[in-house]
Amino acid sequence: MGDSLTLEGKAQLITRNLQELLGEDKMKEILKERPLRIYWGTATTGKPHVAYFVPMSKIADFLKAGCEVTILFADLHAYLDNMKAPWDLLELRTRYYEQVIQAMLQSIGVPLERLRFIRGTEFQLSKEYTLDVYRLSSVVTQHDAKKAGAEVVKQVEHPLLSGLLYPGLQALDEEYLKVDAQFGGVDQRKIFTFAEKYLPALGYAKRIHLMNPMVPGLTGAKMSSSEEESKIDLLDSPADVKKKLKKAFCEPGNVENNGVLSFVRHVLFPLKSEFVVLRDEKFGGNKTYTDFETLEKDFAEELVHPGDLKASVEKALNKLLHPIREKFNSPEMKKLSNDAYPDASKQKSVPKGSTKNSGTEEIDPSLLDLRVGKILSVSQHPDADSLYVESVDVGEANPRCVVSGLVQYVPSDQLLGRSVVLLCNLKPQKMRGIESQGMLLCASTEGEQKQVEPLDPPSGSAPGERIYIEGYENGEPEGELKPKKKVFEKLQVDFRISDDLCAQWKGKNFLTKLGSVTCKTLRGGSIG
């Protein structure tokens, strides 16, 4: 296909869905003469997850554009990055990566024979490469090495020298792999600019750098191999996929930090050029989208329900994962997976005298800063028909600005002057350009017609009054919940409205000093 494309056609394929490109003019000059040589590297650390389909889909684009593509399994980098891959597991994890990455590529129809696969230790331990590491270390400052790895290398209080070597090795890989360009996530940008600065100091050419955006995880933050709740593993069962997608952050009308929507944009559309939203006939039936922008617009305007979007992504994702699951269902592949990633609970003994069991430690609900709020004003969001912008008094010097997707469910006159329950220590987040400084908690029920009702504090409660969970009165809330810990998301799973219309967590009531937090009618509803 690459031979039949025009120069502009090749450039468009290479650059579509990228967040940034450094060296575009140089890329076009090379494309006039010959195929572009690109490499993508992956450190063989934690298990690859579904976000890896983003670079896989771009690799498919590169091949369609006639590029020569090398995939580097950066085993030495995995060890240098704070020993994310212990030396005794390095070989096993590299083999696992080789098998699973190849299975991913095959599942999206990429011909493996057109790719070059190589391990870092095949050339990084050579005399010439090692000498260049020393040469590079003589010109790179400690400050620049640390800065370059800040977004990629694990940050610890007392960093190891190995983490400072990491960016230099990645820069040298461009020369030793004899490529024109390196492709990676935008989190690699500082390493890429480090390479552009220091390779010429050794007499080597500056390379082109192609960067794809980082796909948000299921909880809204970056998807990460080390954070179980934020990602779907490539070997997760259909039941696990359904469970994780059900819990995924996908607020009606909110297109920012939406991992479900981002997966459609960066994986499903590039692979299939269309996406089908599955809907019941009574809600209009299935709808086929041929461009992402229309889907995003419909979701923002709440013409696409989060439940329908999740169900549609679930079906498409399971289709991609099926051949990978099949490959890893053999006894040989199961053994490789278990050996490369042994169960940590079986590897570590419980310290003498410890009473802590191996189960998941319960999160303390008192970490949530829940307060009584009073809505002082309500207005329509200027850029989103489904969102309100509210000014809420929570007992502080100034009211908080809160954005909520309640337009379809609660008339504004029913909110004005109302006492509500506000979660006050979530990290502030922009919603269609306006920063929301809290979450208004509501009960909801799914069905033919979704119903939503704000939670009601006891009558007479004052703005700013603390709301706590029964039995957890003495705990202190965190100043700001850390998104990576997903405290709210883990607790929210057990939020429910009881038969007597009380808001509860694991059967324990939400309370103020005046009594229980309630809901008007939605028995058995979820809270969020």
From Swiss-Prot:
GO biological process: tyrosyl-tRNA aminoacylation
Signal peptide: none
A single MF term (Gene Ontology): tyrosine-tRNA ligase activity
Recorded GO CC terms: cytoplasm; nucleus
Entry superkingdom: Eukaryota
Subcellular location field: Cytoplasm; Nucleus
Catalytic activity from the UniProt record: tRNA(Tyr) + L-tyrosine + ATP = L-tyrosyl-tRNA(Tyr) + AMP + diphosphate + H(+)
E.C. no: 6.1.1.1
Keywords in alphabetical order: Aminoacyl-tRNA synthetase, ATP-binding, Cytoplasm, Ligase, Nucleotide-binding, Nucleus, Protein biosynthesis, RNA-binding, tRNA-binding
Motif 'KMSKS' region: chain residues: 222-226
Region of interest (Disordered), ranges: 332-362
Protein's UniProt keywords contain Manganese: no
Enzyme class name: ligase
Every tRNA-binding domain range: 364-468
Annotated disulfide bonds: none
Sequence motif Nuclear localization signal, residues: 242-247
InterPro entries: aa-tRNA-synth_Ic (IPR002305), NA-bd_OB-fold (IPR012340), Rossmann-like_a/b/a_fold (IPR014729), tRNA-bd_dom (IPR002547), Tyr-tRNA-ligase (IPR002307), Tyrosine-tRNA_ligase_regulator (IPR051270)
Residues the entry annotates as binding L-tyrosine: 39, 166, 170, 173, 188
Sequence motif 'HIGH' region, location on chain: 44-52
Task of the protein: Catalyzes the attachment of tyrosine to tRNA(Tyr) in a two-step reaction: tyrosine is first activated by ATP to form Tyr-AMP and then transferred to the acceptor end of tRNA(Tyr).
Entry text on domains: The nuclear localization signal, which mediates localization to the nucleus, is also important for interacting with tRNA(Tyr), suggesting that it is sterically blocked when tRNA(Tyr) is bound.
Similarity comment: family membership: Belongs to the class-I aminoacyl-tRNA synthetase family.
Subunit-structure text: Homodimer.
Protein name: Tyrosine--tRNA ligase, cytoplasmic
